Amino acid sequence: MLARIRVRRGVPFNLHHDVRLHSSVGRAPVRLREALFSDFKDVTELKCRCGLLPDSLQNWERLWRHNPALQQGSFERPIGWVLEVEGRLVGYLGNISLSYYYGDRALTAVTGAGFAVEPAYRAVSLSLVAAFYRQRSVDLYLTTTAIEAVGKIARAFKSDPLPQADYETVLFWVLQPYHFTQAVMKKLKLSPTLSHVGGMLTSLLLGTDTIVRRRWPTRGSAGLPVSEIGVDQIGDDFQGLWMEKLKEMPRLLADRSPAALRWHFEIPTDAGTARVLCCRDNGDLLGYAAILSDQDQTTGLRRSMVADMLVKQDDPAILRALLIAAYNHAKRVGSHVLEVLGFPYSIRQVCSQWNSYRRKYPACPFYYKAADPTLHKTFSDGRAWYATPFDGDTTLMF
């Protein structure tokens, strides 16, 4: 199947008509077609069968009817593709439109989301990915939450791993050692006795290590107050910061206009946990950090994440002020851990000053492909990126 797709890469692709595929399972043909909004219920059931968290109808409305990036296109882009056998969905890949900028150049981007295929039909699942990469009028293809197997598929379609250094390494601070270690024990599926004893001992060691090594933000920035607002309070001053950021050194940046920020972080099922920390000087917005908090339903781990952060000239003093505020916010809302994923080296260096712990993904979760070979080569330089959890679908489904 993969070889056949490679041969056909140069063939124009259009899915206004269904495509019939052959599967080794049974005799019924597999149909590949564009997803419809009316497929929501069937996609939800498919995700549940595949062990994935289902989406909400409200989030579908947000992603494919209220997305600011869709207003910039001259045609209606597919919301995704499905595999269908005798009227039953057996595969799905969502397709989310995004706007990016590289210097003064506007780019149309898409990111895959919610990839789900029943095991019996994995042999034809690559047709979903082929449809994604054969879209017309796209400058940049992104995959930002890939497990190892999905990463291999992305490489087969000539996507490359993100060259930004250490994106796959998460920096984190433990805020509540006991609750953190209890969540780890649950993930390891130990017996209640071992979990209790092991958790007590580990949390004691972890707490001691945190104090001895001073693993928390300690140095504030005098004269740089930080305030907290809701997503719906993101105003015109964010537009000024965004415009200034675009004039700095050329880097690939997802659209951070006020409308794009509000759309991204106003998640229907979020219940108001997304907050924005703002650092201002005499009313001038110097930078912001968006914080998302959630709880793992299996382990009980409460996590806060720096989902995005934008600061004038990447000023270390402003970054420190925002990170200290993020740490204090995470403690205040009862999170067990605060995480930082991604960001360029200069920003990670500021985070690392406070002796964070580190954990690494088993494989790179972020892949990209630019339609223009020259642009793709430009993006092979890690310095051209400003990749954060704001990119792709990393926090769109948080």
Regions found by a protein language model. Name each.
Residues 2, 7-38, 205-236:
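Conserved N-terminal entry element of GNAT/NAT acetyltransferase domains
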Residues 30-115, 226-311:
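A conserved beta-strand-loop-helix scaffold within acyl/acetyltransferase catalytic domains
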